[in-house]
Every structure is written in structure tokens, then in C-alpha cells.
């Protein structure tokens, strides 16, 4: 069966800072409760996941600090830009996440928001451990070294 190509307007919103600030352990896909104008804004890629994280309250998971720009044609019924949004997970998944957060001191970070089957909005939540400053420096040094090697190889191939 051939894979369907993703439509250009529906590429996912990605939290690039999550990999830099956290050591991501596991990922879980969750649905999200949104209003109609929020879905329309997300179709136009008008969202920001940079500071988004999930919090467990009373056996429910909420996505905090997820900014969705108000829909330009929304009128007076538009949604607030930042508000807690409920995530849809099974009870066992919530209990598992709650145990990890309480026992191991891990954090729930939103890493990606995308449309599944061009209908439903899904959020990828990562369970992660915050990195220390020296870990971030090590990652930056490794990345710089890889870029130097790539540049050197590219320039050496150019003169052959």
C-alpha cells in the first residue's frame, strides 16, 4: 500500500526547543479538545508550542501555555489565545504518566501538533527529564563538530 503524502498546508507544528531543553524518554499521542476557530487557526499553522507543557489535574491532563493565534475571520466568537486545553487519553495512560511524573520527577512536554487523517488534531506528548546546563553545552559542542565535519567534506569535494 502506498503512503499518502502530507498536504503542504498541514505540516505539523514542532517544538524544536524540547529536544534542546529536555532528555526525551517516551512519546504518547493524545487528542485535544478545541473550538472550531482554534482548528481553523491550526490549519493555517498559527500556533506556538515553544513553552507548552502538560499538567495532570484531578485525573485529567491539560495542555498549558499552548498559544493558538485567534482566527482572523472568527469575529466576536473567537477563542482566547492561551488557555488550558484538555487532552484526551485513556485512564491507564493518565495513571502511567502520573506515576512517572511523581516518582521519577519527569516532565510532560508537548513536542508536536498535527492533523491525523486530515480530520483530527493530535498532540504528541513527550515524557522528559530536564537537562542541566553542562548537558546542553555538550550537545551544542557535538552539533558544532558535526557541522565542521560536514563543511570540511563539502569543501574538499568541491575542489576535486
UniProtKB/Swiss-Prot annotation:
Residue ranges under compositional bias (Basic and acidic residues)?
135-146
Identify the PROSITE patterns for this entry. Answer: SSRP
Q: Which organism is it from?
A: Leptospira borgpetersenii serovar Hardjo-bovis (strain JB197)
Q: Which family does it belong to?
A: Belongs to the SmpB family.
Subcellular location per UniProt equals: Cytoplasm
Q: Which gene encodes it?
A: smpB
Q: Does the keyword RNA-binding apply?
A: yes
MF terms in GO: RNA binding
Q: Which GO terms describe its biological process?
A: trans-translation
Main subcellular localisation: cytoplasm
Protein name per the record: SsrA-binding protein
Q: Which UniProt keywords apply?
A: Cytoplasm, RNA-binding
UniProt-listed SUPFAM superfamilies: Small protein B (SmpB)
Record carries keyword Cell wall biogenesis/degradation? no
Output the PANTHER family linked to this UniProt entry.
SSRA-BINDING PROTEIN, TMRNA-BINDING COMPONENT OF TRANS-TRANSLATION TAGGING COMPLEX
UniProt cross-references to Pfam families, sorted A to Z: SmpB (PF01668)
What the protein does comes down to: Required for rescue of stalled ribosomes mediated by trans-translation. Binds to transfer-messenger RNA (tmRNA), required for stable association of tmRNA with ribosomes. tmRNA and SmpB together mimic tRNA shape, replacing the anticodon stem-loop with SmpB. tmRNA is encoded by the ssrA gene; the 2 termini fold to resemble tRNA(Ala) and it encodes a 'tag peptide', a short internal open reading frame. During trans-translation Ala-aminoacylated tmRNA acts like a tRNA, entering the A-site of stalled ribosomes, displacing the stalled mRNA.
Q: Where is this region: Disordered?
A: 132-160
By its UniProt entry, which InterPro entries does this protein fall under? SmpB (IPR023620), SsrA-bd_prot (IPR000037), SsrA-bd_prot_CS (IPR020081)
Q: Name one GO cellular component term.
A: cytosol
